[in-house]
Amino acid sequence: MSWRSERIWIELITGSRKTSNFCWAFILFLGSLGFLLVGTSSYLGRNLISLFPSQQIIFFPQGIVMSFYGIAGLFISSYLWCTISWNVGSGYDRFDRKEGIVCIFRWGFPGKNRRIFLRLLMKDIQSIRIAVKEDIYARRILVLYMEIRGQGAIPLTRTDENLTPREMEQKAAELAYFLRVPIEVF
């Protein structure tokens, strides 16, 4: 989502509160809870889950392994729920032509660097760059960067943002026009 006027462009960044993260955290929680209950029921010798009789799964080694997977899954699920509740990765990009300042803000993990805030001068922006990256499945992903003098490139889009090449090109062209800088493609 973005908001634009003649002088200011504000781009809101979603972060970790996406539908897919909610689904994965919920599925992982239920699955790991099931594994832990099956492992515990095999240890106790009682049916805590009515799907499997506890006599079919002996505690050593199947019950121990299922309990371990259940505990590990609960830890990973709690990590996902924490990132969702802290909204890690969300924030905004603000481009202010009137003041000549670019502000990039992101929420991080709790601690000393929870708030990540970058303030840059517009005159230091060299270009808007579109780079092609390949993920582990050999898919090509387009990522939008802002090239800054003396500081390198700052990513403006996430790698999981599924924009078509036309949409990415349109976004880069509009931003480059707004900032009055050239576009580079790598």
Curated annotation (Swiss-Prot):
Gene Ontology annotations of biological process type: photosynthesis
Main location group: plastid
Lineage top rank: taxon: Eukaryota
Coiled-coil residue windows: none
Pfam families: Ycf4
Keywords: Chloroplast, Membrane, Photosynthesis, Plastid, Thylakoid, Transmembrane, Transmembrane helix
Membrane-protein topology: Multi-pass membrane protein
Name listed for the protein in its UniProt record: Photosystem I assembly protein Ycf4
